[in-house]
Amino acid sequence: MEPAEQPRTSPAVRAHHARARLGASLFFFLNGFLISGLLTRLPEVKGLLALTEVEFGFIIAALPVGSIAAAALPAPLIRRFGAAAVASAGTAVLALVFTAAAAVAALGPGAEAGRSPGPAGPAAWSPAIPWIVAALIALAGFLDAVVDAAQNVHGLIVEQARGTSIFNSLHAIWSVGSVTGGGLGLLASTLRIPLWAHLSVSGAIGVGLALWAWRLSGPNPFASDRTGPAPRKRTVIPDEDDSGETTDATGTTDATGTSAEPGRSAADARPAAGTTGAEETGTPDGTSVGDTAGGEAARPASSASGPDRSAAPSKWALLAGVIALGLLGAFVEDLGMNWSSLYFSEVGGVGVQFAGIAFVVALTGQLIARFTADRLTDRIGRPGVVLSGGVCVTIGMLLAMGVAQPWAVVVGFFLSGYGSATFIPTAYAAAGMIPGLGHGMGITLASWALRIAMLSSSPLIGLTAGALGLRYALVITVVAGLGAIVLAFTPVLRNVDTGRR
């Protein structure tokens, strides 16, 4: 006998969604936590390995190089094993790789000077050790790219199953994890806890929480892009909206109360016994949630469901626009994270002891926006959120550049951090909802492009500052804000918007 159908508002379904959201949140938290734990103690790595500045630069570069090398690998992994499984396994291995890197670094010649000796002591020194550390850091970058794509896919799956936005707050939780990991790293360094001991504890925490996050998500959670040897049926969580119509997890509606997929009844949409109650398997071609095996989004035949798909932009045009939005966000965030303190000091005219205020207010604005943007997304939709963010960035950077007084710089960078906070999460979410592209492929390509952008943004800002002066280098972020405003009026976001349910 099939289990009784449960509406999305039932206590069992709400509890399931709460567990899944907690699992997704843990993935994002751990990703920020693990990486920042190492980054805060990189100077000790330099000392342990007795590196020159040039050699240290190559060690640091290994992380982004490894992440870019991952290229499109996350997509097939997600389709084969499921997003939650890939995120969990990748996070656990990432934690172990960081631990291994710290243990190997502790064998360096710097330990002879009393710098955090490892369990094997300095006698185990070999000229190959710096190369091994660089290889491990490159592997960490590779794994981070895989985990980044998988956790974003899983977060989007949970969001679509819930029917309400959570994507911005998930990215805010990544920031909380980063601050937590960095704070613990700073505390460990202050207490002179050896690097290998610190990262061993962090690694154990990472492995344990990654496995727990997977258990919270279930072995094949929600609408993962996992595929088997043959296409399998898509199951849908029914949802009663205010009109009494039933809406599936992707937002498509049928007035008869059945799922929007032709030939499917409400009984077909019920989960099979033993499933999570919200599981959806993909198709062999990796089409996204709501897509049929042929690649077209599942929709009612009625024209009331939206414009004709043939009139919509191609999936590649949509992907290009989504990536463009992410690139704009990367440039604005890079300015706030890496250049705000210098700008406040040199252009705002404050002492170096107060220069960090600009960084703090930019980060504060970003966190506030990400924790509050989900509710706003549900109300006005993703295009409206991006539009308002673009306006904030444009006004804030014009204020900081035009007035260039301390108060104006502080207000300007707060508005910039607040406004740009939703650009990258929105780009990830939109990339995962492009019809005809699987979650894994869309988000993987967007993530890969963003990593390249983050490598190039600071040099471009530096070149602009060298040509025009640091004050007028902010013109790049003004252009980014205007670009976001333009994108908000294009089909790029309207075609994949899930707000205003």
Q: What do these predicted ranges mean?
A:
Residues 69-83, 189, 369-381, 465-466:
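Helix-to-loop junctions at the C-terminal end of transmembrane segments
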